[in-house]
Amino acid sequence: MSDEAKEKRELESQKESSHNKSEKSVEPKPKRRRRRNYDDYDAEVAKEETKAKNGLTKSENNGTVEDSESDMDDAKLDALMGNEGEEEEDDLAEIDTSNIITSGRRTRGKVIDYKKTAEELDKKEPSTDSKDDVGYGEKEEDEEDEEDEEDEEDDDFKEQ
């Protein structure tokens, strides 16, 4: 046991000495920061600017040639724009009107025959109404059936 304790103490002293060494090594070596030298870059930019200015004066002299080219480009662009308008009209002509749902209910793309679904619901849940309440309860049942159908549609949509 005493040997183990001595080894532990030796390790602790080594850790402390290494810790002190690392602190000492950091302090005497300050990091030197270098500044970037942009003088060369500034000279290049100045040269490019002078070339650009010289190019502008030359282009002013040759402006008539560039104007005719730009007119040709404008004519081409106008022709292209005219073609795009025709393409949009063609897209509208390609729409199949048989797929458009004209009913007022949103069905998320499903075509629902409400009469058939009402019959199916009646088969699943036979009505327990008495003959006395037939006239009074029909409207409420229709509303409930519609809500049930919508809930089932929502459930089907969530499952997909």
UniProtKB/Swiss-Prot annotation:
Residues covered by region (Disordered): 1-160
Biased composition (Basic and acidic residues): 1-29, 110-138
Compartments (UniProt record): Nucleus
Keywords per UniProt: Acetylation, Chaperone, Nucleus, Phosphoprotein
Main location, first listed in the record: nucleus
Residues found modified as Phosphoserine: S68, S70
Annotated positions of the N-acetylserine modification: S2
Cysteine pairings via disulfide bonds: none
Ranges annotated as biased composition (Polar residues): 56-65
Region span, Important for H2A.Z-H2B binding: 87-108
GO CC entries: nucleus
Residue ranges with Acidic residues bias: 84-94, 139-160
Protein role: Forms a chaperone-bound H2A.Z-H2B complex that acts as a source for SWR1 complex-dependent H2A to H2A.Z histone replacement in chromatin.
Subunit structure as annotated in this protein's UniProt entry: Forms a heterotrimer with H2A.Z-H2B, stabilizing the association of the histone dimer. Also, with a lower affinity, forms a heterotrimer with H2A-H2B.
Annotated family: Belongs to the CHZ1 family.
Name of this chain's protein: Histone H2A.Z-specific chaperone CHZ1
Species per Swiss-Prot/TrEMBL record: Saccharomyces cerevisiae (strain YJM789)
Gene: CHZ1
